[in-house]
Regions:
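Inter-lobe coupling/hinge segments of SF2-like helicase ATPases
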Residues: 1-172
Length: 172
């Protein structure tokens, strides 16, 4: 078992040390996250960013390759020139991470390019669009966890899973 609460609680319930409760419905007024899988498309990315900014929200752009984050920032700046963009990843020192997160929370940034550092523990209710670049490099449970960073209020949330153009999307 890990140190996370779910396995510990499950172990306690199965061992009869604790009762098991089930949550079968989402919180009242909670909407399902609309998830789209797409190849990189400047128009789709621009539209998703502009829709969120126009309604006063913010965006996570997950890009798990720290070496190329600055080139992604440049590319996003060209797609949406008025965007205020921050960068957060685990190779920053703690003070820099905290500084960048505070700027994002205080709405100095419209979008933050980040690594999977956001996977757990963040609950910023104003962030309701997440774009996950190169989603094929993540596991399914990791994608689900990262996607869960949005949609934490009654506001409609969107998740865009970006795959490289060289892969084909088959219809189900």
């Amino acid at each position: 078992l890990t140190a996370t609460p779910i396995p510990r609680t499950l172990n306690a319930a199965l061992s009869s040390f604790r009762d098991l409760s089930l949550i079968e419905t989402p919180p009242e007024n909670r909407k399902s996250i609309i998830t789209k899988i797409t190849e990189w498309d400047d128009n789709i990315i621009r539209d998703s960013i502009e829709r969120e900014v126009d309604r006063g929200g913010q965006i996570y752009f997950v890009h798990n390759d720290i070496k190329t984050m600055n080139s992604i920032k440049l590319k996003l700046s060209m797609i949406s020139p008025k965007l205020n963009i921050g960068i957060i990843h685990a190779q920053l020192d703690n003070r820099a991470i905290e500084n960048q997160m505070n700027k994002f929370i205080n709405k100095e940034y419209d979008l933050v390019i980040c690594s999977s550092i956001i996977e757990s523990g963040l609950d910023i209710t104003n962030v309701n669009t997440i774009i996950i670049n190169d989603c094929h490099k993540f596991g399914l449970s990791q994608l689900h966890q990262i996607r869960g960073r949005v949609g934490r209020t009654s506001r409609q949330a969107y998740s865009y899973l970006i795959i490289p153009n060289k892969y084909k999307i088959s219809s189900v």
